[in-house]
């Protein structure tokens, strides 16, 4: 019964061109393979100093953590938490096994029945799932639309206890930045708490410190910062930063923290070194220089209209997106095609991620191949 049901559902996905599958990424085996899909913005996943730190951590502490943080799995983890809190300028931080686990664990623990969540329409799936797991009422405001947000708050605020405004710092599919300065003012005015998922802002904006620093905003009692170590940091895991009471409460109530085996200590050692390198500033400066170069070249080839501040570029090709992505692979370029339900129908795009490892020639090759594919296969778009 289950097998036949799943077969029918999989067939439906294939018929609607929505079927997902795992593809072998040859970029590590083929030096002629251009990778524009990676979130390793600062190329720290292959940094020698970090790899040496990982080796040292493995030799010192062993392969795995062997337990959750509240049992046997608290090894060098508090050293990393101290480093992250120092880096972000907050009282405390807490690390989780992934960015997804962080959002789900933080939101479901803090947001309760009788509370109200206002969530941006384009927030990451992990935020959406965290909201679903909470007992709070959830309202969605139009993407970065402050008037719509204020309208929803004024119509609903008086009926609830705590107000939570939740947003990505940098939106993962479009690369745009949430107006945190305006969101902070709104949170202050309506006695709300602002939760920022800065997965794609940490290491990228604000001299590496993230989206909050980009707006010259300081951490405060009503701001909770969430991040990941799997993007610019180049490693694995997630973290949350905030005041002492928030972190202590999460240690006692956040289920994805309490019931997960902690990160391997070797990974923790690598992440500590990575934050040290990011704090020096050089990797982020190099990335911003490359973003400026990419802006220039992508504009020349009519692939973008406005300059980006982040390394995420959406090239919207709608229903032709997946075909273009397949043709790029045949041309030794890995650039992920993103389609519904990750993005709305009619907004299918190539999600181009640039890193410090890309050169001017790499950007030009990508543009030329895309335009050639469009010309040959689609007779232009």
Curated annotation (Swiss-Prot):
Chain positions found as N6-(pyridoxal phosphate)lysine: 231
Keywords: Biotin biosynthesis, Pyridoxal phosphate, Transferase
InterPro entries xrefs: Aminotrans_II_pyridoxalP_BS, Aminotransferase_I/II_large, AON_synthase_class-II, AONS_Archaea/Proteobacteria, PyrdxlP-dep_Trfase, PyrdxlP-dep_Trfase_major, PyrdxlP-dep_Trfase_small
One GO process term, biological-process aspect: biotin biosynthetic process
GO molecular function: 8-amino-7-oxononanoate synthase activity; pyridoxal phosphate binding
Residues reported to bind pyridoxal 5'-phosphate: 99-100, 172, 197-200, 228-231
Gene: bioF
Protein's name in the database: Putative 8-amino-7-oxononanoate synthase
């Amino acid at each position: 019964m289950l097998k036949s049901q799943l077969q029918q559902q999989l067939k439906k996905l294939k018929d609607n061109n929505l079927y997902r599958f795992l593809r072998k990424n040859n970029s590590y085996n083929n030096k002629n393979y251009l990778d524009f899909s990676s979130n390793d913005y600062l190329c720290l996943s292959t940094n020698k100093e970090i790899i040496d730190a990982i080796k040292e951590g493995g030799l010192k502490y062993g392969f795995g953590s062997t337990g959750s943080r509240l049992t046997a799995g608290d090894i060098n983890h508090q050293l990393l938490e101290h480093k992250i809190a120092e880096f972000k300028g907050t009282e405390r931080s807490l690390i989780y096994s992934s960015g997804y686990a962080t959002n789900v664990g933080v939101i479901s623990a803090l947001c309760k029945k009788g509370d109200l969540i206002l969530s941006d329409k384009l927030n990451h799936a992990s935020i959406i799932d965290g909201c679903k797991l909470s007992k709070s009422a959830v309202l969605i405001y139009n993407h970065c639309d402050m008037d719509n947000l204020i309208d929803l708050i004024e119509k609903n605020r008086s009926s609830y206890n705590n107000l939570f405004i939740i947003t990505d710092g940098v939106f993962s599919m479009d690369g745009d930045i949430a107006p945190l300065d305006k969101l902070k003012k709104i949170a202050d005015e309506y006695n709300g708490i602002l939760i920022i998922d800065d997965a794609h802002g940490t290491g990228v904006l604000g001299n590496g410190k993230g989206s909050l620093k980009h707006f010259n905003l300081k951490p405060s009692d009503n701001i909770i910062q969430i991040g990941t170590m799997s993007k610019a940091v180049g490693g694995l895991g997630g973290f949350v930063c905030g005041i002492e009471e928030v972190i202590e409460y999460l240690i006692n109530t956040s289920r994805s923290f309490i019931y997960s085996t902690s990160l391997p200590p070797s990974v923790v050692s690598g992440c500590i070194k990575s934050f040290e390198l990011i704090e020096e500033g050089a990797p982020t400066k190099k990335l911003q220089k490359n973003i400026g170069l990419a802006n220039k070249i992508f504009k020349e080839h009519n692939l973008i209209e406005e300059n980006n501040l982040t390394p995420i570029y959406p090239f919207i090709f709608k229903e032709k997106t997946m075909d273009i992505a397949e043709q790029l692979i045949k041309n030794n370029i890995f650039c992920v095609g993103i389609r519904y339900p990750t993005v709305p129908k009619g907004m299918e795009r190539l999600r181009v991620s640039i890193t410090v490892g890309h050169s001017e020639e790499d950007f030009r090759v990508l543009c030329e191949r895309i335009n050639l594919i469009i010309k040959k296969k689609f007779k232009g778009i």
